[in-house]
Design a protein with these regions (language model features):
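Loop-to-helix transition at the N-terminal end of transmembrane alpha-helices
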Residues: 1-19, 32-41
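Structural signature of hydrophobic alpha-helical transmembrane segments
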Residues: 3-15, 60-72, 125-129
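A generic, lipid-embedded transmembrane alpha helix
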Residues: 19-20, 39-55
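Membrane-interface capping segments at transmembrane-helix boundaries
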Residues: 27-28, 139-149
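Cytoplasmic-side transmembrane-helix entry/capping segments in multi-pass membrane proteins
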Residues: 31-44, 63-69, 89-99
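Hydrophobic alpha-helical transmembrane segments in multi-pass integral membrane proteins
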Residues: 49-57, 104-118
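Alpha-helical transmembrane segments in multipass membrane proteins, preferentially the mid-helix core
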Residues: 72-86, 108, 138
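Loop-to-transmembrane alpha-helix initiation sites
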Residues: 115-133
């Protein structure tokens, strides 16, 4: 894959925003579970955005089905604002994102999307499982924070 200057600028901006946000998280006086949940969800979201945009999770990066991931991230961001970043709401929201991540992968495989990949369907199922596990882990951190208060 050949990267353009724009690709490098987007990647640099993504990393600066990610590390800046994580830095801000750890100077706040939230519980360590809440901070861990935020950091894990930010890293997962940034990684999903990067992978889906750069190489694509379903087929290649140009495959239209990959647009489900930015849509999912947008809903996650809107949902975070709606629940006002409360641990209880974030736990449910990230649980939903974990389920949505798996659902997107399963629907893609059942619909036969991305068959041009040499490792189809294992690549879609494995990445869906890994990202789902990351979302659910972040949600678990928020759930534990909510239950221990």
């Amino acid at each position: 894959m050949d990267w353009s200057v724009f690709d490098f600028l987007v990647a640099a901006l993504l990393l600066v925003l990610l590390f800046g946000a994580i830095g801000l998280i750890f100077v706040r006086r939230w519980s360590w579970l809440y901070r861990l949940g935020l950091a894990l969800s930010l890293v997962t979201g940034a990684l999903l955005f990067w992978v889906a945009g750069a190489v694509g999770l379903i087929g290649g990066a140009a495959h239209d089905a990959n647009m489900a991931y930015p849509a999912m991230l947008t809903l996650g961001l809107i949902g975070s604002v709606v629940v006002r970043f409360k641990a209880s709401g974030l736990a449910l929201l990230l649980g939903g994102l974990g389920i949505a991540q798996l659902a997107i992968g399963l629907i893609a495989v059942l619909a036969g999307l991305g068959q041009d990949s040499q490792r189809w369907p294992d690549d879609i199922l494995a990445t869906s499982f890994i990202f789902s596990l990351l979302w659910l882990s972040a949600g678990f951190c928020f759930w534990r924070d909510w239950k221990t208060r």
